[in-house]
Every structure is written in structure tokens, then in C-alpha cells.
UniProtKB/Swiss-Prot annotation:
It comes from the Bacteria. Signal peptide: none annotated. SUPFAM superfamilies: Macro domain-like. The keyword Hydrolase applies. Keywords: Hydrolase. It comes from Salmonella newport (strain SL254). This is O-acetyl-ADP-ribose deacetylase. It catalyses: 3''-O-acetyl-ADP-D-ribose + H2O = ADP-D-ribose + acetate + H(+); 2''-O-acetyl-ADP-D-ribose + H2O = ADP-D-ribose + acetate + H(+). The gene is ymdB. Pfam families: Macro. Homodimer. Interacts with RNase III. NCBIfam families: PRK00431.1-1, PRK00431.1-6.
């Protein structure tokens, strides 16, 4: 049986999955890192959809997630989530990061998505230590997929080889084949 969890090193904007997750900022207006890359690749339709969400419900709070069409991307949808800014680990960062992953998965399940791709949420400009963030990501996603049939396939998309090895090691430790 193939694992429902896989690690990919590469560009999340190039994946043909039901949903890609955007590590967004609260404004949903694009930014640096993966957020900027997703907005550039998706084109202006993504920004328009994000503006509409802001008009309807305001900013996206830390740990929350919202869904938009994917614009020019191969994915069906983009799920935007706001991870926590690392402030030393004493400000509920772990709980908020777990909540961000779980809320993305709940949106994917509610929309009957079979596949979802996650970047390493909060590990860029938000400064979350990669190893700790990866442990939370793998644990949260693993717990979720034991309880829900969807999504059937979850990809951890890592920009660099070091992060990909970190995720692969964590999946191997829990008995999953990350390839």
C-alpha cells in the first residue's frame, strides 16, 4: 500500500493537485516566499478572490484558513492559512500551527478534495524553527488522516533538500514511506 503522505522537493505552484496550501499573511494580499510565488503563478484572479474574502470577513486570523479558486495554477483551489510568527515558543505558536494545518485539512475534506499539498508553514519569514514545525505538520496531518478518508493524498512540498530530508526522516520514523 502506498503511503497517503509524501515528500516532494520542488515548486508547489507546479503541482497538479486538488488544493495547494498558501502560507499567507493575514491580509491575504500576497507577500514574500511561497505566498508571493503562489500569487504570481496564479495571476490576478487569485488576488481578486482574496480581496473579496477580505471585504466579506476581514483579515484571516492566525490558525484559520480560507479557500479560493486557483487562478492559472494547475490545482483546483488554493487554501490560504496564516501560520504563527515564532516568538520563542511561549505564545501558543505550536497550537496555532497545528490549528493552521488542521483547518486546511478540514476545508479539503469538506470540499471532497482527494489531494492537498502543503508548504512548510511559518518556517520562512515567520521564523518558526524548521524541525519543530515539521514535527507539528507530520503529527497533525497523520492524526487527521487516520480519522478522515479525505484527502487521500497529502504532499509536503519542500523548497530545499535539507527540509525535504527532514520531512522524509519524520515520515520514516512513524512508519510511512515518504517517496
Amino acid at each position: 500500500m502506498t503511503s497517503r503522505l509524501q515528500v516532494i522537493q520542488g515548486d508547489i505552484t507546479q503541482l497538479s493537485v486538488d488544493a495547494i496550501v498558501n502560507a499567507a499573511n493575514a491580509s491575504l494580499m500576497g507577500g514574500g516566499g511561497v505566498d508571493g510565488a503562489i500569487h504570481r503563478a496564479a495571476g490576478p484572479a487569485l488576488l481578486d478572490a482574496c480581496k473579496l474574502i477580505r471585504q466579506q470577513q476581514g483579515e484571516c486570523q492566525t490558525g484559520h484558513a480560507v479557500i479560493t479558486p486557483a487562478g492559472k495554477l494547475s490545482a483546483k483551489a488554493v487554501i490560504h492559512t496564516v501560520g504563527p510568527v515564532w516568538r520563542g515558543g511561549e505564545h501558543q505558536e505550536a497550537e496555532l500551527l497545528e490549528e493552521a494545518y488542521r483547518n486546511c485539512l478540514l476545508l479539503a475534506e469538506a470540499n471532497h478534495f482527494r489531494s492537498i499539498a502543503f508548504p512548510a508553514i511559518s518556517t520562512g519569514v515567520y521564523g518558526y524553527p524548521r524541525a519543530q514545525a515539521a514535527e507539528i505538520a507530520v503529527r497533525t496531518v497523520s492524526d487527521f488522516i487516520t480519522r478522515y478518508a479525505l484527502p487521500e493524498q497529502v504532499y509536503f512540498v519542500c523548497y530545499d533538500e535539507e527540509t525535504a530530508r527532514l520531512y522524509a526522516r519524520l515520515l520514516t520514523q512513524q512508519g510511512d514511506d515518504p517517496a
